[in-house]
Regions:
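Conserved RNA-binding domains used in RNP assembly and mRNA/RNA metabolism
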Residues: 2-98
Length: 98
């Protein structure tokens, strides 16, 4: 089994590398996009966040930023223990309901 070392600096908080990044986050029950502006305990605080009700074709969502159904919610928090996976979001964050 392969081991990946994220940081050897004990002063670096876990997941700190994601601070100020825009992400598409999937949990078991919902999906969000937003910019990580703070990491507190087990939570990402997201700015300009949206709940993604229907991502559509996943490749188009990630590569082109095309989402079928999205609800901008502003600020949101997601428990990092609930995250199943996440992807860089290299697009503008949604501003309108679709």
């Amino acid at each position: 089994m392969k081991t990946v070392i994220v940081s050897t600096d004990s002063n670096t908080p876990p997941l700190a590398e994601f601070l100020n990044q825009k992400l598409f986050i999937r949990t078991l029950t919902y999906h969000l996009v937003g910019k990580v502006v703070a990491i507190t305990d087990n939570f990402f605080e997201l700015e300009d966040a949206s709940w993604v009700a229907d991502s559509g074709r996943f490749m188009q969502a990630i590569k082109e930023g095309k989402l079928n159904e999205v609800e901008p919610v502003g600020r949101a928090w997601v428990n990092t223990d609930a995250i199943t996976d996440m992807f860089p979001w290299d697009h503008d964050l949604p501003k309108t309901q679709k």
